[in-house]
Amino acid sequence: MPKDFKPPRTPRKTPYPDRPHKSKSKSQPDREEKQHPSVNELKRRIRDVKRLLAKPDLSADKRVIQERALAGYEKELADEERRRERSRMIKKYHFVRFLDRKTATKEVKRLTRKRDELAKNSDIDEATKQKKLEQLNVRLHTANVNLNYTIYYPLTEKYISIYAEKKKKNEGQNEDEDVQMEGGPTQEEEIVTAATTAQKKAMLQTVEKCMQDGTLDLLREGKLNLNADSVTEGGTKTETKSKPKSKPSSKDTGVKTVGGKENAKPRTKTSDSKRGKSAKHTAPAPAESDSESDGGFFEI
């Protein structure tokens, strides 16, 4: 038998001959992911455009084009930073929101089941049943508001847990004696707790109003103007900044005037020593000005 002879290979029999063969070379279709712009790249483009606009010999047509490009880059940068901040806040408070939503859902289901059982119960007087049903409806409405609070709280803001106080009370029952021995919470902690509680109550009222108006989705995305009613802080700040500072009078500064003009600066020790005067004559001058200025500022 010659060496070059090769017997024909019989094809291997498979139990599923009609099944199409999957080639390994074909890659799986990639997921469609939106390519977000790079912040550093946008900042670099903004710097380049600003440098180009700073040139005095730039033509008017090119200047208009570059100004439009600059406005577009700045808008893209602001949108990207806002998107990243939103994503960061979602990841940060995801687990807390999940626990609160789970607790609120259980509360809604429990009250709904209790209301249905009470409505089907015929052993109670009609007046008593109506009274209890009204109470359950009020509690169920509050539970629904709490549930919507956990779902539609603005994603771009710091989330305040709605059941944090109850958990702290349950955990703090065994530690009351230790807290009393230590002297109780500090004044700063009480102020922070009061501010957090006030902010949570305000958000609950906002959620209840959005439930009536049907704008819960806008609240979740942060598209509602929540600061419309609370413009007092910004207004007071602008008012304080806009107030012009009054010029200090001669009485407040302690500088004596002659004919409506201020005197010259007090002579220093070096100038007096050059003219032959001793330091004893120059010492009372700053003391007089200091006493007069202090009396002007702290005068009641």
Swiss-Prot record:
Residues 1-44, 168-187, 227-300 are annotated as: Disordered. Residues 27-36, 262-275 have a biased composition (Basic and acidic residues). One of its GO terms (cellular component) is nucleolus. It is found in: Nucleus, Nucleolus. The keyword Nucleus applies. GO terms for biological process: maturation of SSU-rRNA from tricistronic rRNA transcript (SSU-rRNA, 5.8S rRNA, LSU-rRNA). The keyword Transmembrane helix does not apply. Its main location: nucleus. Belongs to the EFG1 family. Involved in rRNA processing. This is rRNA-processing protein efg1.
